[in-house]
Amino acid sequence: MSTQLRHCGLDFGTSNTTLAVARGNELSLLLPLEDGKPTIPSTIFFDFDTDRTLYGRAALAEYISGTDGRMMRSLKSILGSSLAEEKVRIKKRILSYLMIIGGFVGELKARAEVEIGERVLVSDAQG
């Protein structure tokens, strides 16, 4: 296994999200994040019956099936606005939108680690 670090690039879109990895000069590769597909809907569903948090297509399916809960989409539009630090009630929990978005990014990180078989480190653009 190479000791050279892989680089991950996250495209957090309003509707869909993708994640690509590359090492050195190799071509970047979009990872299959859900059901073998390289895109995952930027959607979160909080299931009130089971207290599970679902992401992507699974989140949409639970919402469409009528499961009691709360669906959130288009969270990217909150970033950079005064709403980012605002808090929202999800059943008995109070969460900021940044915490909710952080949960989505954390889920993507976990899926990427499973897919590439390596730990993914998160940092800002400056390292």
Predicted regions and their residues:
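Phosphate-binding loop and its immediate beta->loop->alpha context
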Residues: 25-127
